[in-house]
Amino acid sequence: MLCAIYKSKKKLGSYLYVANREDFSSVPSVLLEHFGKPELVMMFNLLGRKALYNVDCNEVLETIKRQGFYLQIAKQDDGLFNSLSEIK
């Protein structure tokens, strides 16, 4: 499965993974507001042999299947995205 990976210009080290390029329909609008305009980093095959940095491909794949997107945040994040369930 290919996914599109976007980085945040507002939140250093934050990445948003979606199943289809430019399709943010499953991402809550409040999350997108905090994330800022997504900047495409790359298309990535989650079922391929290459690994992602600091995140498990299977976890990303399952989360995209379940909720339509995956949010990767920097470990030193200030807590803005930590309660994603409240944003939905």
Swiss-Prot record:
Top-level taxon of the source organism: Bacteria
Family annotation (PANTHER family): PROTEIN YCGL
Full protein name: YcgL domain-containing protein CGSHiGG_01115
Organism per entry: Haemophilus influenzae (strain PittGG)
Domain YcgL: 1-85
Gene3D superfamilies: YcgL domain (3.10.510.20)
